[in-house]
């Protein structure tokens, strides 16, 4: 599970335990196979719904989706959705459950991906660059305060 090693960070110490839980889960081969197929067919909601493994949550399952999505760039390719990206989106006033019209995470994830690709297109950037920016900001999206130089 390279995406778990990639995204575990160095501060919380839970990465090895969660990675071991995922690697020990008997469902692992089938989950990786079926979710890869769902992602490659453009069914991101279905992939999200099917990705159930011990020790793996949204941040890592969506990293898997982004890693295996090799569709043409014209498609709304899978993006990573982790807590840092969510902090930034929420700080900007965007709510996945309101945008999706449901609290069901598979639909919310697909709505997030679609929204990000739409915003990226209108801004003239790629969706993965926009995702990186939101990750980097981690919710710190305030502009300059009154009286501060913005340069």
Where are these regions (language model features)?
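Short, hydrophobic/amphipathic alpha-helical patches that form generic packing surfaces
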Residues: 1-13, 63-67, 131-135
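C-terminal accessory module of base-excision DNA glycosylases/AP lyases that mediates lesion recognition
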Residues: 59-62, 69-151
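Helix-hairpin-helix/helix-loop-helix acidic hairpins
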Residues: 1-56
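Alpha-helix boundary/capping residues
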Residues: 35-39, 68, 92
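A near-ubiquitous, low-amplitude feature marking generic local secondary-structure context
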Residues: 44-48, 68, 99
């Amino acid at each position: 599970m390279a995406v778990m090693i990639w995204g575990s960070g160095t501060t919380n110490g839970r990465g090895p335990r969660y990675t071991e839980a995922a690697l020990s889960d008997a469902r692992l081969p089938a989950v990786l196979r079926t979710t890869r197929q769902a992602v490659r067919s453009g069914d991101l909601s279905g992939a999200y719904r099917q990705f159930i493994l011990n020790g793996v949550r949204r941040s890592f399952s969506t990293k898997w989706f982004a890693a295996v999505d090799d569709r043409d760039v014209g498609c709304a390719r899978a993006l990573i959705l982790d807590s840092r990206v969510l902090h930034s989106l929420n700080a900007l006033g965007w709510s996945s459950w309101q945008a999706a019209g449901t609290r069901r995470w598979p639909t919310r994830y697909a709505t997030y991906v679609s929204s990000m690709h739409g915003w990226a297109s209108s801004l003239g950037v790629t969706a993965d660059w926009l995702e990186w920016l939101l990750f980097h900001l981690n919710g710190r999206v305030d502009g300059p305060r009154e009286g501060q130089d913005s340069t």
